[in-house]
């Protein structure tokens, strides 16, 4: 691949079954570590099969205060429950240091912040969420406040002034309430949960709760698309790093299906070229892209 080709990922022209025929919804709580650790699965699925599906994060965080009205747990219509599995989730304890009970009003504020960021676009919301999770789980921020949320907005390269206006806006509140309602309609009882729907069909959706092997997600996607689908080649390593900006050796190794040793050899070459900075955090090695950001698609 030449230098110019390595800068961008060009999706091929869609065929009859490549029109984003599947809609995926990932139900998360931003303060739950399992919801952070599923992200490499989603990134890999998107890189290989992103032309077949769209994905949206649904925030399931707790509402603020004891007077907030609760939704009834309705039996979801038109959804097939496939698997449910207990993961390493214990309450909302993250890394043994970040606990929900330590931050009674945090879930509402954090959820509103994610919705405020999403008002600038789905991609902006995803960038903000990833940056927020880095603060929470890598720097042990147990009680994200407005100052930290503004820092996340700045680090995510979204419009900070717009974010400030939207943080307590009716639009962000309505978006969060819609997420809560959808969570209840889908009868989400475990996070993370992933729900797939065929965009152009009245057929039932598929829900998978917990975290499974990557092949399971591919299998479900193929079942819904209902035609032969092949994975796209993964992008060059530099393209992934430009897009994510900050990623661990473990995540990169998973995405490329290589050993950490192999991946770190390549990453150290980029370090010598002064394209990445190596950062050791909590017995895990992370890599920060130094050059200007470029998107995957």
Curated annotation (Swiss-Prot):
Could you list this entry's UniProt keywords, alphabetically sorted.
Cytoplasm
**Location within or outside the cell:** Cytoplasm
State the GO CC annotations: cytoplasm
Q: Does the keyword Transit peptide apply?
A: no
User: Cross-referenced Pfam families, in alphabetical order?
Assistant: Thioredoxin_5
Q: Which InterPro entries match?
A: Adapter_SpxH (IPR046404), Thioredoxin-like_sf (IPR036249)
- Indicate whether Cytoplasm appears among the record's keywords: yes
Family assignment from sequence similarity: Belongs to the SpxH family.
Q: What does this protein do?
A: Adapter protein required for efficient degradation of Spx by ClpXP under non-stress conditions. Interaction with Spx stabilizes Spx and exposes the C-terminus of Spx for recognition and proteolysis by ClpXP.
Q: Which protein, by its recorded name, is this?
A: ClpXP adapter protein SpxH
Q: Which organism is it from?
A: Bacillus thuringiensis subsp. konkukian (strain 97-27)
């Amino acid at each position: 691949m030449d230098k110019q080709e390595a800068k961008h990922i060009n999706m091929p022209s869609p065929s009859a079954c490549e029109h984003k025929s599947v809609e995926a919804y990932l139900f998360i709580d931003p303060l739950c570590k399992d919801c952070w650790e599923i992200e490499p699965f989603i990134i890999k699925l998107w890189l290989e099969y992103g032309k077949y599906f769209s994905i949206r994060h649904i925030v399931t965080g707790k509402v603020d205060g004891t007077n907030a009205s609760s939704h009834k747990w309705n039996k979801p219509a038109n959804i097939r429950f496939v698997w449910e599995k207990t993961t390493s989730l214990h309450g909302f304890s993250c890394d043994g240091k970040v606990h929900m009970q330590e931050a009674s009003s945090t879930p509402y504020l954090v959820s509103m912040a994610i919705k405020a960021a999403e008002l600038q676009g789905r991609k902006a919301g995803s960038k903000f969420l990833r940056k927020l999770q880095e603060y929470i789980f890598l720097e042990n921020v147990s009680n994200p406040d407005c100052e930290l949320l503004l820092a996340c907005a700045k680090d995510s390269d979204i419009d900070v002034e717009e974010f400030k206006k939207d943080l307590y806006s009716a639009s962000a509140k309505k978006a969060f309430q819609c997420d809560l309602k959808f969570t209840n309609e889908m009868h989400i009882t475990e996070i993370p949960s992933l729900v797939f729907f065929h965009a152009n069909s009245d057929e039932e959706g598929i829900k998978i709760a917990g975290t499974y092997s990557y092949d399971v997600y591919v299998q479900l996607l193929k079942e819904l698309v209902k035609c032969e689908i092949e994975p796209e080649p993964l992008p060059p390593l530099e393209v992934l790093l430009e897009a994510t900006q900050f990623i661990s050796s473990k995540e990169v190794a998973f995405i490329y299906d290589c050993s950490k040793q192999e991946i770190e050899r390549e990453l150290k070459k980029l370090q010598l070229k002064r394209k990445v900075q190596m950062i050791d955090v909590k017995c895990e090695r992370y890599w920060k892209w130094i050059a200007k950001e470029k998107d995957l698609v």
